[in-house]
């Protein structure tokens, strides 16, 4: 019998939430229904365990590795919800969203939709320099994307009873979600108390 060791963050009603480095998690193939993740954006954030300043091509190679693993772990009707930025300006402008979606399709994922997450956070309004001499402005989008991908079948193969209301269904199937993201300070506080 194989022993699986992972950092289980929480168990609720038969659902296991795992908080660990995805490439180090040892789980059986086709055993996961849903993966929700926000991978490092490669913009220099200190994650303690991940170098978030690698060259962009290395970042895309690393992305391809974990997307391949995600595909093998998902059930045939499994889904991947991927929170990623539209682009990044640090170290040169890069189309992160477009590059990662292309890699996901190349490794075998099927595309379902993209949800726009309006974080309502425009804290860097002067990032493009002086408005008095705006010769090369940056467009700052206070949004991120949640890309919804699936393995083989978008329709869930096993039927079950819905546990959401009609209103929740309508709200959650709208492609624009508006709620504030957590600040780095809030995340640091949460990490400190775990």
Curated annotation (Swiss-Prot):
The keyword NAD does not apply. PROSITE patterns: N4_MTASE (PS00093). It holds the Pfam family N6_N4_Mtase. GO terms for biological process: DNA restriction-modification system; methylation. Keywords: DNA-binding, Methyltransferase, Restriction system, S-adenosyl-L-methionine, Transferase. GO terms for molecular function: DNA binding; N-methyltransferase activity; site-specific DNA-methyltransferase (cytosine-N4-specific) activity. InterPro entries: DNA_methylase_N4/N6, MeTrfase_CN4_CS, RM_Methyltransferase, SAM-dependent_MTases_sf. Its EC number is 2.1.1.113. It catalyses: a 2'-deoxycytidine in DNA + S-adenosyl-L-methionine = an N(4)-methyl-2'-deoxycytidine in DNA + S-adenosyl-L-homocysteine + H(+). Belongs to the N(4)/N(6)-methyltransferase family. N(4) subfamily. This is Type II methyltransferase M.MjaVI. It comes from Methanocaldococcus jannaschii (strain ATCC 43067 / DSM 2661 / JAL-1 / JCM 10045 / NBRC 100440) (Methanococcus jannaschii). The gene is mjaVIM.
């Amino acid at each position: 019998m194989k022993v699986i060791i992972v950092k289980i963050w929480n168990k609720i009603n038969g659902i296991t939430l795992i908080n660990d480095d995805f490439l180090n998690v040892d789980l059986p193939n086709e055993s996961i229904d849903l993966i929700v993740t926000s991978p490092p954006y490669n913009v220099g954030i200190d994650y303690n365990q991940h170098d978030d300043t690698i060259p962009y091509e290395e970042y895309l190679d690393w992305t391809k590795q974990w997307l391949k693993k995600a595909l093998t772990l998902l059930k045939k009707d499994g889904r991947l919800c991927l929170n990623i930025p539209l682009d990044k300006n640090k170290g040169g402008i890069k189309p992160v969203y477009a590059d990662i979606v292309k890699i996901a399709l190349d490794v075998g994922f099927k595309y379902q939709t993209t949800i726009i997450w309006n974080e309502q956070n425009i804290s860097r309004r002067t990032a493009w320099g002086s408005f008095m001499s705006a010769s090369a402005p940056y467009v700052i989008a206070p949004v991120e994307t949640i890309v919804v991908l699936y393995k083989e079948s978008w329709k869930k193969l096993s039927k079950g009873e819905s546990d959401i209301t009609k209103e929740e269904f309508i709200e959650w199937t709208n492609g624009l979600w508006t709620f504030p993201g957590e600040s780095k300070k809030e995340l640091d506080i949460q990490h400190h108390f775990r």
